[in-house]
């Protein structure tokens, strides 16, 4: 899955949620706001956004951070949301009964969400640079 010339500044930690009962379009609207943010900043943004997609995404970020802490012993304060993907999952097909024996089709979409966190070392990393954004400063790769 990963290329041989991976120049990431630290280890990657991933968490995957499959078959989440929401459309991928609605999840992408939330995901685009937290891409590139630090762990604490991403959770703060998700708490304040008024969308239903924020709850499963914040659970997934908590899970990825817990994986980083438990499996690799990393500090949660040094984590960065480096890559986030939302893919469409299977569509559940249902039928809404209507008058005179008819049935209208109902499609219930699902999505798969992948979150990759990276550890950043802010003191001696020439690959990272500070970038000013509306919500404060964010560490990004050059």
From Swiss-Prot:
Main site of residence? plastid
Note the CDD domains from the entry: Ribosomal_L22
The family database entries (InterPro entries) matched by this protein are listed as: Ribosomal_uL22, Ribosomal_uL22_bac/chlpt-type, Ribosomal_uL22_bac/org-type, Ribosomal_uL22_CS, Ribosomal_uL22_sf
User: Which locations, inside or outside the cell, does it occupy?
Assistant: Plastid, Chloroplast
User: Known PANTHER family for this protein?
Assistant: CHLOROPLAST 50S RIBOSOMAL PROTEIN L22-RELATED, LARGE RIBOSOMAL SUBUNIT PROTEIN UL22M
Family (UniProt): Belongs to the universal ribosomal protein uL22 family.
What is the protein named? Answer: Large ribosomal subunit protein uL22c
Gene symbol of the encoding locus: rpl22
